[in-house]
A protein has these predicted regions:
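Mature extracytoplasmic domains of secretory-pathway proteins
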Residues: 53-112
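Early exported N-terminus immediately downstream of N-terminal targeting peptides
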Residues: 18-67
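Short, exposed beta-strand "edge-strand" segments with a Pro/Gly-rich flavor and a Y/T-containing core
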Residues: 33-41, 80-84, 133-140
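Bacterial Sec-dependent N-terminal signal peptides
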Residues: 1-22
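Residues that form generic nucleotide/phosphate-binding pockets
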Residues: 25-29, 72, 148
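C-terminal partner/receptor-binding element of secreted or periplasmic proteins
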Residues: 127-151
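Short, surface-exposed coil-to-beta transition loops
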Residues: 92-94, 112-118, 128-130
């Protein structure tokens, strides 16, 4: 039973953010899973924030790894409705992309509009980079998320 629950959770995680080139980072295929700290939250815990899914990965990357991650993320960002990026010394240190999403209401299984977000934050450290990559989906607007993260 527990194994079935874990398998279901894995399928939900994959389907929640399918279609993004950055997915190999979340799946531990670009950065070894042993170097990644992952957080995954869904359901009622996120309701006060108008989100359905929150998934983040944190890790330390080499310059080559960061370059690959940035290329994947920027390619995904081409399809975004809203984009915010910041560079420091030629390195992408902040990115926030908002995509429109069709999600299904759990109550009626009817399509409803929502948002999907990909966020990147990079902190340079001597010869490596501390990286946080976040995927979120829900009804929260960009302004609401900005307020949430300010507090």
């Amino acid at each position: 039973m527990i194994l079935a629950l874990w398998a279901l959770l894995a399928v939900i995680q994959l389907s929640a953010q399918s279609g993004y080139g950055i997915n190999p980072v979340f799946d531990g295929k670009l950065i070894p899973s042993s170097r990644i700290k992952e957080t995954y939250i869904n359901g009622t815990q996120l309701a006060p924030y108008k989100l359905r899914v929150f998934r983040s990965v944190k890790f330390t990357a080499t310059p080559a790894e960061l370059s690959r991650i940035q290329a994947l993320l920027l390619e995904d960002g081409k399809g975004a409705e809203d984009r915010q990026t910041e560079y420091t010394g030629g390195v992408l240190t902040y990115a926030l992309f908002r995509f429109r999403a069709e999600v299904h209401s759990s109550r009626y299984d009817m399509p409803v509009e929502g948002n999907k977000y990909l966020c990147l934050q990079v902190f340079p450290k001597e010869t490596r980079y501390d990286v946080t990559l976040v995927y979120m989906s829900g009804d929260a607007t960009l302004d609401e998320l900005k307020q949430l993260f300010k507090n």
